[in-house]
UniProtKB/Swiss-Prot annotation:
HAMAP family: Asna1_Get3. It comes from Drosophila ananassae. The active site is at 58. Zn(2+) binds at residues 275, 278. Belongs to the arsA ATPase family. It is found in: Cytoplasm; Endoplasmic reticulum. It holds the Pfam family ArsA_ATPase. One of its GO terms (biological process) is tail-anchored membrane protein insertion into ER membrane. This is ATPase ASNA1 homolog. SUPFAM superfamilies: P-loop containing nucleoside triphosphate hydrolases. Keywords: ATP-binding, Cytoplasm, Endoplasmic reticulum, Hydrolase, Metal-binding, Nucleotide-binding, Transport, Zinc. Homodimer. It is an enzyme of class 3 (hydrolase). One of its GO terms (molecular function) is ATP hydrolysis activity.
């Protein structure tokens, strides 16, 4: 391949300008600055899209720290923005842990059926968290955000999250097949509990609705016009190794990936004037940047700087987010 190939634009401008995108996942190894990158991307998207939602699926929930604002399981407007919202979900949570807001607008029978459904779901391992995820996706789709950015947990959890629509499809299909067998018993069970309005058909309808939404999401996740994944790494061996594993797994899952962010880079203007540790780190980073250039010549590779101060608060993120659009250039130090 390649000596004649023009390197691709080293920014995320290609994503921000792709109007058809509905779902953008941002992920990588722990400690590489995923949350700063996903929050910055969401801020840039908010400039050109009608409404943007950033969802943290990392149990550490760093987006509250990044924006210096407490977020919950329900979309909340980010301070300083009119069209940027954030929420935090636990991908391992069960259906009963979802807040009641998720069931607003449902009739009383369906709200009560949440508990009955939980009893049925307990019989199928792994379906509980899948159903919780299904409810979240239903809520998100129902709110019609222009684009949703996922700030994901470290790599292993991320791959599970992306595979979840398929797990849910299988699980809900199983539940619906069980329906005919359990319907008489279920009707008897709910009438004993005094829930006359709840019946097997009500639950079945709820499951059918969920299955339809999840099937739709599953199709969208595999459509590169609607879904893409941004890998975040640092210029070190283990991070690069993890990134390559992630790219291969995503390709296997049929998820589009063509953007890599290399974060926390030293931009030395004169390595001779730098301390020995900085000069040494700079050399190591240059070595891995060369490897990244060889491995990912058909990717957009965005390089972000290691800063003296942490990126925290909406204004700080707004300022840092410009580096996603325009390649970072260090400011020249004034001569003494």
């Amino acid at each position: 391949m390649g000596d004649n190939l023009e390197p691709l634009e080293p920014s995320l401008q290609n994503l921000v300008e792709q109007d058809s995108l509905k779902w953008i996942f941002v992920g990588g190894k722990g400690g590489v600055g995923k949350t700063t990158c996903s929050s910055s991307l969401a801020v840039q998207l908010a400039k050109v899209r009608e409404s943007v939602l950033i969802i943290s699926t990392d149990p550490a929930h760093n987006i509250s720290d990044a924006f210096d604002q407490k977020f919950t399981k329900v979309p909340t407007k980010v301070n300083g923005f009119d069209n940027l919202f954030a929420m935090e979900i636990d991908p391992n949570a069960g259906l009963n842990e979802l807040p009641e807001e998720y069931f607003e607008g449902e009739n009383e029978a369906l709200r009560v059926s949440k508990g009955v459904m939980q009893e049925m779901i307990n019989a199928l391992p792994g379906i509980d968290e899948a159903m919780s995820y299904a409810e979240v996706m239903k809520l998100v789709k129902g709110m019609n955000f222009s684009v949703v950015v996922f700030d994901t947990a470290p790599t292993g959890h991320t791959l599970r999250l992306i595979a979840f629509p398929q797990v849910v499809e299988k699980g809900l299909g199983k539940l619906l097949r069980l329906k005919m067998k359990v319907a008489p018993m279920l009707t008897q069970f709910v009438s004993m509990l005094g829930m006359a309005d709840v019946n097997a058909d009500t639950l079945s309808q709820k499951l059918d609705d969920m299955l339809r939404i999840i099937t739709q999401v599953n199709e969208q996740f595999k459509n590169p016009d609607q879904t893409t994944f941004v890998c975040v790494c640092i210029a070190e061996f283990f991070s690069l190794y993890e990134t390559e594993r992630l790219v291969q797994e995503l390709t296997k899952c049929g998820i589009d990936v063509h953007n890599i962010i290399v974060n926390q880079l030293l931009f030395l203007q004169n390595s001779h004037d730098s301390c020995s540790m900085c000069a040494s780190r700079y050399k190591i980073q240059e070595k891995y940047l060369d490897q990244i250039a060889d491995l990912y010549e058909d990717f957009h590779v965005t390089k972000l700087p290691l800063l003296e101060k942490e990126v925290r608060g909406p204004e700080s993120i707004r300022s840092f987010s410009e580096n996603l659009m325009t390649p970072y250039e260090p400011k020249a130090k004034p001569k003494e």
